[in-house]
């Protein structure tokens, strides 16, 4: 029994949700899209997928998970909208659908859907996008296994407000032509169209995300990637090894990527880009939509982590990599010279006990470092940054923090108008494009 078969037997979610689809012969990958109140936008996402070559579409099953919680928890208008989405999808699958969506099916899109919306099929009260993704990915994994795709099958996660490029499926397939390919994040770039206030907010949000990744890279963290749910790709084997998609209402992408990084390697796919929408949303407690909404409501300042926090993180990781033979007390004492709060944080995490145990149980340096980063994972990294935020390195204005990190990376754009950046949308856009390009260069 391989890892995928074991996962499907022991951990995969099934009842009461059922995959509605046509023939599955020849399917090698699946694109899973959770959809909540997306009747107006889902066709745009499906059309962007349908613009991929017919030969690529023949290998791919597109699974839309129409989901909401029960009445009284979910909004009545969202439930009604979801029923319209289900009607649309079922019509497309049955006979090509209404005129507005017929082009999608004529292009060769292989469509499937899951009803996690109707009475008796709703998500539980604490369910959310994480569970919706899990339901879809588990169902897709089962279909891929039945189709004979095996552990090399590929699972792609995106969103119903996200547009993909015409080479999306090909770029992912080419990446997974390498047998060792485990997990990856496709390049992303939020669309900078729409209402001015929303565009301004998403400009700042994506800059914050890329600022954070730049700081993590400067610190040499193995968790230096953006956690954007619409970008995640993994092999069937990796999905099973990671224990499936995290079920959280938000942050599911963060925890799932962390597990993928602990069990293998998270790479970058630069050959194509996905384009999330710059829209506000109340549906999740954090993430792009919530950040944009809070910014519009005046509850979100333009701030990000203090650059010194990444310097302290880098000091810790340097000590670990340069002196793996050292006693934990020496590591803590040296770290305290850079930041006493960081050393105290590690003490609260029982660092000394963990360090000694890792040294005893690791046969070589490679295993030791891998085990250390499984312990000091993305979540502990974030907890350290939050601890430093609360003990001497408070959140900093976004634009000045970006400048500091770019200076440290020796990647500051030439002759850039930093002094007037806060009120200059054109310059902010240019800065974001610079950060996007820098991220591509650093992960090639």
Predicted regions and their residues:
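Conserved donor NDP-sugar-binding/catalytic core segment of glycosyltransferases
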Residues: 163-203
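A recurrent flexible, glycine/aromatic-enriched loop bordering the glycosyltransferase active site
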Residues: 213-233
């Amino acid at each position: 029994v391989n890892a995928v078969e074991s996962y499907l037997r022991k951990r995969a979610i099934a009842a009461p949700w059922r995959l509605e689809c046509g023939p599955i012969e020849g399917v090698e990958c699946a694109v899973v899209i959770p959809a909540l109140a997306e009747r107006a936008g889902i066709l745009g996402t499906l059309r962007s997928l349908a613009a991929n070559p017919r030969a690529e579409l023949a290998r791919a099953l597109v699974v839309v998970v129409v989901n909401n919680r029960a009445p009284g928890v979910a909004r009545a208008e969202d439930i009604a909208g979801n029923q319209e989405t289900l009607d649309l999808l079922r019509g497309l699958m049955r006979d090509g659908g209404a005129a507005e969506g017929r082009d999608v099916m004529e292009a060769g899109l292989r469509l499937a859907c899951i009803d996690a919306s109707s009475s008796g099929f709703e998500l539980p009260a604490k369910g959310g996008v994480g569970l919706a993704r899990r339901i879809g990915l588990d169902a897709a994994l089962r279909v891929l296994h039945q189709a004979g795709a095996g552990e090399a099958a590929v699972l792609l996660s995106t969103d119903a407000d996200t547009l993909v490029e015409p080479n999306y499926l090909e770029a992912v397939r080419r990446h997974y032509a390498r047998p060792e390919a485990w997990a990856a994040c496709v390049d992303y770039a939020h669309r900078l169209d729409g209402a001015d206030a929303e565009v301004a907010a998403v400009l700042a949000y994506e800059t914050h995300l890329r600022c954070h990744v730049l700081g993590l890279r400067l610190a040499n963290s193995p968790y230096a990637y953006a956690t954007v749910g619409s970008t995640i790709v993994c092999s069937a084997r990796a999905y099973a090894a990671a224990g499936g998609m995290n079920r959280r209402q938000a942050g599911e992408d963060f925890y799932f990527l962390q597990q993928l990084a602990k069990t293998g390697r998270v790479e970058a796919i630069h050959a194509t880009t996905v384009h999330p929408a710059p829209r506000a949303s109340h549906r999740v407690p954090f993430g792009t939509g919530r950040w944009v909404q809070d910014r519009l409501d005046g509850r979100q300042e333009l701030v990000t982590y203090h650059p010194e926090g990444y310097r302290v993180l880098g000091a810790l990781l340097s000590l670990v990599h340069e002196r793996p033979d050292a006693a934990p007390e020496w590591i803590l004492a040296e770290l305290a010279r850079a930041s006493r709060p960081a050393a105290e944080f590690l003490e609260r995490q029982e660092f000394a006990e963990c360090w000694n145990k890792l040294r005893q149980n690791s046969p070589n340096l490679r295993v030791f470092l891998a085990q250390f980063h499984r312990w000091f994972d993305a979540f502990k990294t974030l907890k350290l940054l939050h601890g430093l935020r609360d003990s001497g390195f408070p959140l900093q204005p976004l634009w000045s923090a970006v400048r500091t990190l770019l200076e440290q990376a020796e990647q500051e754009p030439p002759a850039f108008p930093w002094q007037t950046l806060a009120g200059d949308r054109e310059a902010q856009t240019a800065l974001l494009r610079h950060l996007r390009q820098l991220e591509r260069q650093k992960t090639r």
